[in-house]
Amino acid sequence: MARFRGSITKVSRRLGIALAPKAEKYLERRPFPPGQHGQGRKGKISEYALQLREKQKMKYLYGILEKQFRNYYKKAVAQRGVTGDNLVKLLERRLDNIVFRAGFSPSRAGARQLVSHGHVTVNGKKVDIPSYLVSPADVMEFRQKSKNMSAVTDSLNKTPESRIPAWIQVDKAHQKAVFLSVPERADIQEEFNEQLVVELYSK
């Protein structure tokens, strides 16, 4: 699948949110949009622009292009419950997101590579599809030949226990994680407003 290959730091500055760890320091130094007039941009933002910005935040955060993101929205609409909540929960269930949340990679992009390169198994079977939707009680583990990779070990060592969400149980020694349950929206601390995205697609 095609992926965004531009400057993630420029996009982060434009959207006002760190989309990757390396973008955090740039936002601290330059917390304004890129470009010659980035610091001086003022004026009221239209409702459509706000909705579009929130959609872009979600797409870039989870590393998803428009067609797939719209498909997630359609699935969210078809499910019972609040559409916005359903959308976020679907994105959180992606295998690459779980690998990231468990601390096996410092970024979702890195987690996506680990999955697509065939390093990860789900319930004992190799899964190389980053968008694979994990279900409660599923066990994610690195293949035997992939265990103890320096990138994974370093990430686990640098990931504090407080960063690992309550809905994922991680066994660092065996590089294994169990998806305990689908999180509630209130438990997902991300800087976007999915309701604006729902309003955008509902037009």
Curated annotation (Swiss-Prot):
InterPro entries: Ribosomal_uS4, Ribosomal_uS4_bac-type, Ribosomal_uS4_CS, Ribosomal_uS4_N, S4_RNA-bd, S4_RNA-bd_sf
S4 RNA-binding domain span: 93-153
SMART domains per UniProt: Ribosomal_S4, S4
One term of GO molecular function: rRNA binding
Organism domain of life: Bacteria
The keyword ATP-binding is annotated on this UniProt entry: no
Any GO CC annotation of this UniProt entry: small ribosomal subunit
Entry's Gene Ontology BP terms: ribosomal small subunit biogenesis; translation
Pfam families according to UniProt: Ribosomal_S4, S4
Record carries keyword Ribonucleoprotein: yes
Keywords: Ribonucleoprotein, Ribosomal protein, RNA-binding, rRNA-binding
Family indicated by similarity: Belongs to the universal ribosomal protein uS4 family.
Assembly information from the UniProt record: Part of the 30S ribosomal subunit. Contacts protein S5. The interaction surface between S4 and S5 is involved in control of translational fidelity.
Function (record text): One of the primary rRNA binding proteins, it binds directly to 16S rRNA where it nucleates assembly of the body of the 30S subunit. With S5 and S12 plays an important role in translational accuracy.
PANTHER family linked to this entry: 30S 40S RIBOSOMAL PROTEIN, SMALL RIBOSOMAL SUBUNIT PROTEIN US4M
Annotated protein name in UniProt: Small ribosomal subunit protein uS4
